[in-house]
Swiss-Prot record:
This enzyme's EC code(s): 2.4.-.-
Subcellular location: Golgi apparatus membrane
Membrane topology note: Single-pass type II membrane protein
Pfam families: Exostosin_GT47
Residues in compartment: Cytoplasmic: 1-3
Residue intervals on the Lumenal side: 25-417
MF terms (GO), sorted A to Z: glycosyltransferase activity
Glycosylation sites (chain numbering): N144, N405
Superkingdom assignment: Eukaryota
Residue intervals passing through the bilayer: 4-24
Name the UniProt record assigns to this protein: Probable glucuronosyltransferase Os01g0926700
Keyword Cell inner membrane: no
Family under the similarity heading: Belongs to the glycosyltransferase 47 family.
Length: 417
């Protein structure tokens, strides 16, 4: 057994040395690979001139006042809802004439209610969202003519507009009934799931671009780490028996590979975390309580091949980013075979994935920079909205027609906010 482990370790070291040298050539020579098919063109689309967005002017209690009370919201992985609002206020797609708008946006910061430790509390979010919708339905005519079908909302919670961080309870709640006709822009994405409805736009979580930029290392640094991961394997406070968190996938990673020399995995989060990702060939991106996490963004930005362990996940901007070509997908049940899966990937396949990841448009699409830049996540969201135009005949209701049930949902959600 020891000889086998030693042989694997030697093989891994040789692979890492070779890949590191090749990656160094890629970075020094700025070698990238054109994204195949139409995806590259889609990433580089300019949404300006293809749609107009009207931004509702809501009282500050729905947005800016919440942020003023707790500025930590700007650095949270759910901060896309704040930065999207800021972006649209000065965007060329914004119109001040609602009669010419293709889309209507309601700026509600539903995740900006944090615990002392910085975790979001979603319990007030449904009442807050409902209050905002009641306001726009009362003061403007545009909601009522479509009951939200030409409106979009940014809902970056763990399980989107189901507004709960535990999947079982999120499923029990379902999507807020008043949002059933709206387009949801959300980080959560999983096929055939109650909390992802048809037509939603799946986006990356927020990861601070400036912070990542500050941790860039020289481009000629070899990738000497084969597999890298930092994070929880067990969530003992919320899942003391250990069978529910990450559907056991993270626990399986730890139990199978904690002593494997190929795997640099730990619960410790070192100050060199970003640098270590840039020294790694593969970065594990397993599900946690939800399928997604900022690791996916970080892996792409730092050119570390994302190893996605989350069955049926719907990835950000999947119609534009060729995830199958840049990442590795491992079924949750196959985690015990992770070492053999990764070591069996041909070197030329790994190098091609690295060249694709080196494409600047790939990295840009995953970020919400300040100020906004061409091709970034803001523009990918607008591109997604533009591709839904023109609206179909079923968007606008006939006089007197109603599609939504304003009294549906949990009783607690009907209380005033």
């Amino acid at each position: 057994m020891r000889r086998w482990v030693l042989a694997i370790a030697i093989l891994a070291a040789a692979v890492c040395f070779f890949l590191g040298a090749q990656a160094q050539e890629v970075r020094q020579g700025h070698q990238t690979e054109r994204i195949s098919g139409s995806a590259g063109d889609v990433l580089e689309d300019d949404p300006v001139g293809r749609l107009k967005v009207y931004v509702y002017d809501l009282p500050s209690k729905y947005n800016k006042k919440l942020l003023k009370k707790d500025p930590r919201c700007l650095n949270h992985m759910f901060a896309a809802e704040i930065f999207m609002h800021r972006f649209l206020l000065s965007s060329a797609v914004r119109t001040f004439n609602p009669e010419e708008a293709d889309w209507f946006y309601t700026p509600v910061y539903t995740t900006c209610d944090l615990t002392p430790s910085g975790l979001p509390l979603p319990f007030k979010s449904p009442r807050m969202m409902r209050s905002a919708i009641e306001l726009i339905a009362t003061n403007w005519p545009y909601w009522n003519r479509s009951e939200g079908a030409d409106h979009f909302f940014v809902t970056p919670h763990d399980f989107g507009a189901c507004f709960h961080y535990q999947e079982e309870k999120a499923i029990g709640r379902g999507i807020l009934p008043l949002l059933q006709r709206a387009t949801l822009v959300q980080t959560f994405g999983q096929k055939n799931h109650v909390c992802l409805k048809d037509g939603s736009i799946t986006i990356p979580p927020y990861a601070p671009p400036q912070k990542m930029q500050a941790h860039l290392i020289p481009p000629d640094t070899p990738r000497s780490i084969f597999v890298y991961f930092r994070g929880l394997f067990y969530d003992t406070s919320n899942d003391p028996e250990g069978g529910y968190y990450a559907r056991g996938a993270r626990a399986s990673v730890w139990e199978n590979f904690k002593n494997n020399p190929l795997f640099d995995i730990s619960t410790d989060h070192p100050p060199t975390y970003y640098e270590d990702m840039q020294r790694s060939v593969f970065c594990l991106c397993p599900l946690g309580w939800a399928p997604w996490s900022p690791r996916l963004v970080e892996a792409v930005v730092f050119g570390c091949i994302p190893v996605i362990i989350a069955d049926d996940i719907v990835l950000p901007f999947a119609d534009a980013i060729p995830w199958e070509e840049i990442g590795v997908f491992v079924a949750e049940e196959d985690v015990p075979k992770l070492d053999s899966i990764l070591t069996s990937i041909p070197t030329d396949v790994i190098l091609r994935k690295q060249r694709l990841l080196a494409n600047p448009s790939m990295k840009q699409a995953m970020l919400f920079p300040q100020p906004a830049q061409a091709g970034d996540a803001f523009h990918q969201i607008l591109n997604g909205l533009a591709r839904k135009l023109p609206h179909g005949e079923n968007v606008f209701l006939k006089p007197g027609e109603r599609a939504l049930n304003w009294t549906a949902g949990p009783v607690g959600d009907l209380k005033p906010w």
